[in-house]
Curated annotation (Swiss-Prot):
It comes from Oncorhynchus mykiss (Rainbow trout). Expressed in the ventral brain, with highest levels in the olfactory bulb, low expression, if any, in other tissues. The lineage of its organism: Eukaryota, Metazoa, Chordata, Craniata, Vertebrata. The gene is th. Its cofactor is Fe(2+). This is Tyrosine 3-monooxygenase. Its main location: cytoplasm. GO terms for cellular component: axon; cell body fiber; perikaryon; perinuclear region of cytoplasm. It catalyses: (6R)-L-erythro-5,6,7,8-tetrahydrobiopterin + L-tyrosine + O2 = (4aS,6R)-4a-hydroxy-L-erythro-5,6,7,8-tetrahydrobiopterin + L-dopa.
């Protein structure tokens, strides 16, 4: 159900909107004609490649196992009903007969009782001679129900320590100024050399080091000044209150001004004190999986180079204008910072399909999200708050606006060649965070993850003992808060 615009329909408001749209056209520099880079396209290609590989494998396999040195490693599932009293001993006898070496065995109550008979579901990982695989399976089928074999579920590697983000550096290079003839900087050798020099800073960077400073040229500062001055005036009427509050603090404490491009190290320290987020230099657009994994550690991968001077109001790729004006201020809000980290945590070990959906969610929230404040729709997405034209467009009567629903947003077609035709509006950051939490609960992984803010590490919660340990730390925090309430009572 589209959400109607909260702006007045009076003649005065219509004139103002028309004036802003006209100004948008006048301040928008010659537009880069071509696709705008996004995490979604990268995630989609990875998902399609993985699906094709899986289909090819399934077409050639019946009984699924891994072969190693003449042995077959089987992951075997079956169900034994309670009416068959000797079934367990008979099934164990089968494994004994074929001299199967059992590596792992688990049981759980049967999820689907049949004819009022309860039972147990078994998972057995075992090793048996290659020539005995078919006969062993047939023997088990005579005793048990729902017998099937499956591949061991293998998940994509993901960083578990913040230092391992040094391995998350897979760049999407199709819009690189050295490679893309349509890039505004393709015919400018000076710009291309400058980009390479700044990019090398990111390639050499190791997690935990101070971020090296960049001495920006007069031309680069001029590009920054034009965008900064144009957008600063529009923020008072179009940006959400959280962005405005943080932007004022950044001007006071981090050198934000039309005449100065802030240094990432200064901004990173500011964010760390506010929400625990920190910046890390990156040479371009990361792969979706690597970028989202960084968010799980409250690390935002941030470029240091600036767009080409010929196109100050539009860039086909992320640059420091987009990051510093769009992303950084809103990451200074605690609720939004948690929302961003939750997307990152949900991506760890996720399938290619889920990575694509999470990337699309990121697109329609963190990049192009709108929210309600005092009954008025405001912008919080970085893609909006770093683009005069799209910011005016998003809050005009032209696009469709829908209530934020993660299920719908995750599969919504996106626009990477022009302004978005659809935007999603959240009631509040807290509401968006809770809706995301419900959505993430539906992502299929045989484990959950937890971020440890003391060690900057990810704990994989895949057994009751680990979960119990996490609950103990929560219990300690609750006890401390309860004591604090008692002191105030």
């Amino acid at each position: 159900m589209p959400i109607s615009s909260s702006s007045s329909s009076s003649t005065k408001s219509m004139r103002r909107a028309a004036s802003e749209l006209e100004r948008s056209d006048s301040v928008t520099s010659p537009r880069f004609i071509g696709r705008r880079q996004s995490l979604i396209e990268d995630a989609r290609k990875e998902r399609e490649a993985a699906a094709a590989a899986a289909e090819a494998a399934e077409a050639t396999e019946q009984i699924v196992f891994e072969e190693e040195d003449g042995k077959a490693l089987l992951n075997l599932f079956f169900t034994l009903r309670s009416s068959k009293t000797p079934a367990l001993s008979r099934s164990l006898k089968v494994f004994e007969t074929f001299e199967a070496k059992i590596h792992h065995l688990e049981t759980r109550p049967c999820r689907k009782p049949r004819d009022s008979l309860e039972g147990l579901e078994y998972f057995v990982r075992c090793e048996v001679h290659l020539s005995d695989v078919s006969t062993l399976i047939s023997s088990i089928k005579r005793i048990a129900e729902d017998v099937k074999t499956t591949k061991e579920v293998k998940f994509h590697w993901f960083p578990k320590k913040i230092s391992e983000l040094d391995r998350c550096h897979h760049l999407i290079t199709k819009f690189d100024p050295d490679l893309d003839q349509e890039h505004p900087g393709f015919t400018d050798p000076v710009y291309r050399q400058r980009r390479k020099m700044i990019g090398d800073i990111a390639f050499r960077y190791k997690q935990g080091e101070p971020i090296p400073r960049v001495e920006y040229t007069e031309e680069e500062i001029g590009t920054w000044r034009e965008v900064y001055s144009t957008l600063r005036d529009l923020y008072t009427t179009h940006a959400c209150s959280e962005h405005l509050e943080a932007f004022n603090l950044l001007e006071r404490h981090c050198g934000y001004s039309p005449e100065n491009i802030p240094q990432l190290e200064d901004v990173s320290r500011f964010l760390r004190e506010r929400t625990g987020f920190q910046l890390r230099p990156v040479a371009g657009l990361l792969s979706a999986r690597d970028f989202l994994a960084s968010l799980a550690f409250r690390v935002f991968q941030c470029t240091q180079y600036i767009r080409h001077a010929s196109s100050p109001m539009h860039s086909p790729e992320p640059d420091c204008v987009h990051e510093l004006l769009g992303h950084v201020p809103i990451l200074a809000d605690r609720v939004f910072a948690q929302f961003s980290q939750n997307i990152g945590l949900a991506s760890l070990g996720a399938s290619e399909e889920d990575i694509e959906k999470l990337s699309t969610l990121y697109w329609f929230t963190v990049e192009f999200g709108l929210c309600k404040q005092g009954g008025i729709v405001k912008a919080y997405g970085a893609g909006l708050l770093s683009s005069y034209g799209e910011l005016v467009h998003a809050l005009s009567d032209e696009p469709e606006r829908r209530e934020f629903d993660p299920e719908a947003a995750a599969i919504q077609p996106y626009q990477d060649q022009n302004y978005q035709s659809v935007y999603f509006v959240s009631e509040s950051f807290t509401d968006a965070k809770e809706k995301l939490r419900s959505y993430v609960a539906g992502i299929k992984r045989p484990f959950s993850v937890r971020f440890d803010p003391y060690t900057y590490s990810i704990e994989v919660l895949d057994n009751p003992l680990k979960i119990r340990g996490g609950l103990e730390s929560v219990k300690d925090e609750l006890k401390m808060l309860t004591d604090a309430l008692n002191v105030l009572a």
